[in-house]
């Protein structure tokens, strides 16, 4: 993962912007998916330089097959959502998550802190029954995601400790100069941590909210207000 991260940092620093950049470490191994689009000569130049970078950082070219398969299948979660939840009553949509044995966290951190953050998260989870089943970077090296699953088959222990583990890794991201959620938004789940993340900016948001909505009828309870 560290080698793929170094490659992502280098190509980003050079101004190379792949249409797809996905570095994933899971039970199947570690792969950096890259896909480019644009005019032929520009794409050829990007591909040539990126291959050099990946080899220099310890990578191996396994050909276009795995990335093309990934690209074809990337919509599956959206297809399932459309079939199972879209247009359904809220109770039906929410019941899909009942008793789920995973969580997906999406933090943004300074590039220089990402690898150290990963190591410190592993220490937080040690002995809790919670493990990282997938580490990933999407689009940019500072956008770091982790899928959390039970360390063993003990789902009860996992669920008992999950909230505390999530709280610790998210506040660690904040303490290291990052943010706790870059992908799906804060929602109500992370409401209680928003003031901690925004600092005095949260006071400004509160003042604006009170001025525009003095009786608090617009999305009450959101944004930690």
Across the structure, where does each feature detected by a protein language model lie?
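Activity-critical C-terminal alpha-helical subdomain
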Residues: 187-225
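Hydrophobic, well-ordered secondary-structure elements that form the walls
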Residues: 146, 169, 184, 208, ...
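Basic polyanion-binding and macromolecular-assembly surfaces
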Residues: 177-183
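Conserved beta-strand termini and adjacent loop/short-helix elements that scaffold enzyme active sites
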Residues: 64-65, 183, 220
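C-terminal substrate-recognition/cap domain of FAD-linked oxidoreductases
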Residues: 3-168, 172, 176, 187
């Amino acid at each position: 993962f560290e080698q793929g991260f170094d490659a992502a940092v280098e190509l980003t620093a050079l101004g190379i912007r792949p249409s797809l950049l996905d570095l994933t470490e899971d039970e199947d191994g570690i792969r950096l998916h890259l896909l480019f689009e644009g005019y032929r000569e520009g794409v050829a130049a990007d591909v040539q330089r990126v291959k050099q970078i990946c080899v220099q950082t310890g990578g191996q070219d396994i050909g276009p097959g795995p990335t093309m398969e990934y690209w074809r299948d990337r919509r599956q979660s959206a297809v399932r959502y459309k079939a199972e939840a879209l247009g359904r009553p809220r109770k039906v949509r929410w019941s899909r998550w009942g008793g789920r044995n995973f969580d997906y966290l999406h933090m943004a951190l300074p590039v220089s802190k990402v690898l150290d953050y990963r190591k410190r998260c592993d220490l937080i989870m040690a002995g809790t029954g919670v493990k990282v089943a997938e580490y990933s970077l999407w689009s940019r090296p500072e956008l770091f995601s982790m899928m959390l699953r039970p360390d063993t088959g003990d789902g009860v222990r996992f669920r008992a400790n999950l909230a505390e583990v999530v709280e610790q890794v998210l506040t660690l991201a904040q303490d290291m100069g990052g943010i706790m959620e870059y992908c799906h938004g804060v929602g109500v789940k992370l409401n209680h941590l928003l003031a901690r993340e925004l600092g005095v900016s949260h006071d400004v948001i509160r003042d604006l909210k009170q001025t525009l909505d003095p009786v608090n009828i617009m999305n009450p309870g959101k944004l930690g207000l």
